[in-house]
Amino acid sequence: MSEPKPIQIFSNTNVNIGVNVIKSPVKLTILEMLRDRDMEFDEIVSNTGKSKSTVSVHLKSLRESGIISYKVHPVDNRKKIFYINSKYIGSVDGSDNTQIQETQADYLVKNIVDEDAEFSTLLFHTLKAMLIQEGINIDPILQSTGNSIGKSIFNKLYDDDLDVFMNNLAEFWQRKGLGRLTFNIGQIIKITTYDCFECELLPKTGKPACFLDTGIFEGLFTEFFNLPVKVIETQCYTMGDEKCVFEVEPLGIKS
């Protein structure tokens, strides 16, 4: 028997729609696929392994909820291409409630008193650790928040020389107590952070955790290149690494 999927939460700015909580396993499977890319009806049927009638019912329900929509295929107007029409804001997984060290009192005392960790940073880490323990995933919100922060601080760091801009960013990062940042510029910009403010004290989960950082870099470099960029965290303290590494890749000209 397969494990239950985490409940997913979507929001839509339309006042008549608001927030939708999705629990249906079939709907969750469909939405996971559509978060990766737009898909035709037959593709969705094939990938879910469900009957056409079952998929059709779920797609109709998701459309009526304002979570997805569709467009007519540009070549064959008999076909529909489905896409997500709302914002994915997080998920809740109640299947694992194991207590983790980072939320226990002795761990907090050790880092506040014995190690003299930055209190505001420890508060942030404790909150994130508690969310992880309770199975609450707000990574999309953190990334969106980071994106807004990156765009708001861009003008303070900007220089038309990329090397100077990166040095300004590294100085800002250290001055604000966010960690130590180094970089390597190529077709893909590689950013390495040490003593990461976002994740250094978080539990080892085997997955990257720096979605606020990812969003900040996304916002900064989208503004710098005036292009959409893809930012991927390839190494992280929560993956057992001794640093966090981000790869920034400009994608294409804005339409």
Predicted features along the sequence, with ranges:
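N-terminal accessory segment detector
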Residues: 2-14, 20, 42, 46, ...
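C-terminal non-catalytic interaction appendages of large macromolecular assemblies
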Residues: 209-255
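Pre-recognition alpha-helix immediately N-terminal to the DNA-recognition helix
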Residues: 28-32
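Short capping segments at the starts of secondary-structure elements
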Residues: 25, 36-40
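Catalytic-loop motifs flanking and including active-site residues across diverse enzymes
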Residues: 26, 123, 213-216
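Short helix-coil-helix linker/hinge
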Residues: 20-27
